[in-house]
Each structure stands twice: as C-alpha cells, then as structure tokens.
A protein has these predicted regions:
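Edge beta-strand at a domain terminus
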Residues: 57-69, 105-134
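Residues that act as N-cap/strand-start positions at coil-to-secondary-structure junctions
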Residues: 28, 35, 44, 57, ...
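An anionic, turn-rich surface loop/hairpin at beta-sheet edges
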Residues: 73-100
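N-terminal glycine/threonine-rich, aromatic-flanked beta-hairpin/loop signature
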Residues: 37-79
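Sec/Tat signal peptide C-region and signal peptidase I cleavage site
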Residues: 20-26
Length: 134
C-alpha cells in the first residue's frame, strides 16, 4: 500500500466510527440525550423531547443535518411554573429550534414569537440534573 494512503487509513477509520455514534443514516441525528447546564435535548426517531428547568418542548420531525451540520425545525414550547398546574398553564406555543452539531457538541437556540433563548451548548450523552420550577 502506498505510504500516503496508509497514513490516511487510521484517521478515516476513526472518523467513520465517531460519525456513526452521532448520526444515523443520511445525517439524521441518532437517538439519545444531549445535555447542557439547563436543558436536556432527547433525540428520538421522530424528533426530540426538550426539557428545560422551567419549560418543555417538542420537535415532531426527525432531526436531519444539512451539509454544514445545521438544523432548523418547527416545534412547540410550553413554560412550566411553580406550584400546582392550572387549566391552560403550560399551553404549548409554536417554536423554532435551530442548532449546529460538530462532533459531540451541539449549539441550540430556541425562538418563541419574538423571544430568543440560547444559545445553549449541549454535549452528546450528557444528562444533567435540572432544577425544575415545580
């Protein structure tokens, strides 16, 4: 085997293994948790469940990254408050979830109406303890 090809074999093999842990087929994020200081982004086959300290959200489409590692998907977002829940509390609003994935790190931003939250820095397979507002 020529020397330049031999030098690339190990790095390419390592990249293939690492990419397989983050992506399923077609750059769709593989199922599993991504966690930050105040958020857990749980990727599931058909989207994601998002849990914040005082809110919850949902994305109902598989998270497929573009060629730059970005996604921009619609979802829902609902605030949670302290104390007992009342009728109408936590009603889900339309939201926009934008993210960028590079290796095992995700930058996430959530927009609800004119309110922008983030960016949050998340790490694959991290599941932090959230201090809930309940």
């Amino acid at each position: 085997m020529p020397r330049p090809i031999r030098r690339l074999t190990l790095p390419l093999a390592l990249f293939a293994v690492a990419a397989g842990t983050v992506f399923a087929a077609d750059r769709t994020l593989a199922a599993g948790p991504w966690g930050g200081d105040t958020v857990i982004f749980e990727v599931v086959a058909d989207g994601a469940h998002v849990e914040f300290e005082c809110a919850r959200g949902r994305i109902d489409k598989a998270i497929t990254l573009d060629g730059k590692g970005d996604f921009d998907l619609p979802g829902t977002f609902g605030a949670e408050g302290r104390g007992p829940a009342r009728d109408g509390d936590g009603a889900a609003a339309n939201a926009r979830y934008r993210g960028h994935v590079e290796g095992d790190t995700m930058a996430l931003e959530v927009t609800v109406g004119d309110r922008r939250m983030g960016p949050f820095t998340l790490t694959r397979d991290r599941r932090p303890f959230l201090k809930k507002c309940r």
